[in-house]
Amino acid sequence: MAMTLLEDWCRGMDVNSQRALLVWGIPVNCDETEIEETLQAAMPQVSYRVLGRMFWREENAKAALLELTGTVDYSLIPREMPGKGGLWKVVFKPPTSDAEFLERLHLFLAREGWTVQDVARVLGFQNPAPAPGPEMPAEMLNYILDNVIQPLVESIWYKKLTLFSGRDIPGPGEETFDSWLEHSNEVIEEWQVSDIEKRRRLMESLRGPAADVIRILKTNNPAITTAECLKALEQVFGSVESSRDAQVRFLNTYQNPGEKLSSYVIRLEPLLQKVVDKGAIDKDNVNQARLEQVIAGANHSGALRRQLWLTGATEGPAPNLFQLLVQIREEEAKEEEEEAEAALLQLGLEGHF
């Protein structure tokens, strides 16, 4: 659970999870100064900066995300550190060592009947690199890692798309178009490769009629881009919805019971963008439309909704999506801390009886 939180938090802040620490088990009543003093005392030789703190409801405690800012000796990072209220837990993902990585690479290539020289030749290098070994100079090893192994890793180990065929009844392992498209857009954005490679990976996920559509388009236009392929699939297999229908669906989407307001805003955003794409809302008015619907659709009756109402009542421009989420998340964190403090106070009162 802690590792999942570390990975999700890093992904949300665009931070390399192998350059971050998650410290948790911090008491709710522990302030920023106490947290910093504890971290410095436990890791005096580790260079870091605190990216943020949050209340972790499942643990009824705070958690802090740290980014490692310098050269790191992971042996200096404790798995636990003494702090206020007891031991604080530390979670991190140390990167795989070069030796372990090379060993795993050799095993993989051996199973496939390949050598590093074969890989270099396939990738188009004029002078195939020698096989890496412990006696190899550091400059040559770095060259192989950067120019041979890294392209190989990127082309073999990557997050794959789910399957989509376009059939009326999806087959085993296949998804409906809307869920497939949403997942595909997220994954494709993460791929750090050429558009040609993205298109190849996209084709891997297609079956049946969907694959036939892209093959026909590629035959007519060999230079078709990945974005154009996705657009064509949306036109063929996407739901046919008028601008009026899209707007009605957007305006009738409300916050669910128990759903965080920030989660509601994120769930609302694709519906808003669809309304904008169909021309029902002008792009210049998208921030105002979002704010008005969040105020109207929220079932939150506390200070957070009042603050949003005051934001909408001001004469200034409405906040954009990022600004709105930051405002909401900050208020949610305050409310969670207040709830936790109230719960602790209640437990203390009950302990006196």
Swiss-Prot record:
Cellular localisation: Nucleus, Nucleolus
GO biological process: inflammatory response to antigenic stimulus
Keyword Transferase found: no
InterPro entries named among the record's database cross-references: PNMA, PNMA_C, PNMA_N
Keyword terms, alphabetized: Nucleus
Record bears the keyword Nucleus: yes
Family: Belongs to the PNMA family.
Domain of life: Eukaryota
Protein name (record): Paraneoplastic antigen Ma1 homolog
Known tissue expression: Testis and brain specific.
GO annotations of cellular component type: cytoplasm; nucleolus
